[in-house]
């Protein structure tokens, strides 16, 4: 994923995951919803929906190698993101990330398995090959790329090194057969969304439209804004006794 400008939101940039077809055409763009210090579509939610609609928020690419949907970095920790893609038929989550590679299981590693099992989907997670010009150790992210099948099994895992990679066969026929089986393990089709909808609708944690003024103009996306927004959410939830 990379940072991308949008003429509808002058002065802003979004963290964008994208998929390029063999023709060279960009066939999918997804703007990261959960970002700490950069604008998110949710920060300008009403205007973003007016322009792109909800399907533009959760795009799925129907390709010859399956129905693909991107998950950006830390968002692997947010099950709702993957679920919204699965609702739209996603079969393979392409997870571009930059994270510490560790021989011990990290919380992101655990989340990758969970997202695969919950949605009966493949997770193809690609880590960065090193980090430069930061305060972080330059080789801290070498390794850790992996392919996880729809049962939660890690098919391939790359180790550290400048020329390490991971490859495995993705069996879409088996995945689709699994999704159409009856039984306990079909966690996707057994979802009872109506039972959860009211709880989601009745609670606001991170607020929508925090960068959108009432007159439709945009606030400057300064780092301080995101920190203060998070502090106010903590204070509000603590006052309610939620945290």
Regions found by a protein language model. Give the residues of each.
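Short, flexible, solvent-exposed loop/turn segments with mixed acidic/basic and small polar residues
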Residues: 1, 60, 155-159
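Short beta-strand-to-loop element that shapes/binds the nucleotide-sugar donor at the catalytic cleft/hinge
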Residues: 1-6, 129
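Active-site catalytic loop in hydrolytic enzyme cores
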Residues: 4-91, 101-114
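Aromatic side chains
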Residues: 13-14, 30, 78, 122, ...
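Glycine-rich loops and low-complexity Gly/Arg-rich segments
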Residues: 25, 43-45, 52-56, 85-86, ...
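A generic structural signal for ordered alpha-helices
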Residues: 39, 59, 63-64, 90, ...
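CN hydrolase (nitrilase-like) catalytic-core segments centered on the catalytic cysteine
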Residues: 67, 73-167
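C-terminal beta-strand edge segments of enzyme domains
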Residues: 127-243
């Amino acid at each position: 994923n990379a940072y991308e400008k949008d003429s509808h939101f002058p002065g802003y940039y979004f963290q964008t995951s994208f998929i390029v077809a063999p023709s060279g055409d960009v066939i999918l763009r997804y703007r990261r919803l959960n970002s700490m210090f950069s604008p998110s579509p949710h920060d300008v939610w009403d205007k973003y929906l007016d322009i792109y609609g909800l399907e533009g928020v959760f795009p799925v690419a129907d390709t010859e190698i399956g129905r693909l949907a991107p998950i950006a970095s830390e968002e692997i920790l947010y099950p709702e993101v993957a679920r919204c893609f699965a609702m739209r038929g996603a079969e393979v989550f392409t997870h571009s990330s930059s994270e510490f590679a560790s021989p011990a299981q990290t919380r992101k590693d655990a989340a990758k398995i969970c997202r695969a099992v919950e949605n009966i989907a493949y997770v193809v997670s690609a880590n960065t090959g090193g980090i430069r010009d930061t305060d972080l150790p330059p080789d801290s992210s070498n390794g850790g790329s992996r392919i996880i099948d729809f049962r939660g099994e890690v098919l391939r895992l790359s180790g550290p090194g400048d020329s390490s990679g991971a490859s495995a066969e993705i069996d879409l026929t088996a995945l689709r057969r699994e999704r159409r089986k009856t039984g306990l393990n079909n966690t996707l089709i057994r979802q009872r969304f109506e039972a959860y909808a009211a709880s989601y609708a009745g609670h606001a944690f991170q607020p929508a439209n925090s960068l959108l003024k009432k007159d439709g103009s945009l606030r400057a996306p300064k780092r301080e804004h995101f920190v203060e927004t998070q502090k106010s959410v903590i204070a509000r939830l603590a006052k309610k006794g939620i945290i």
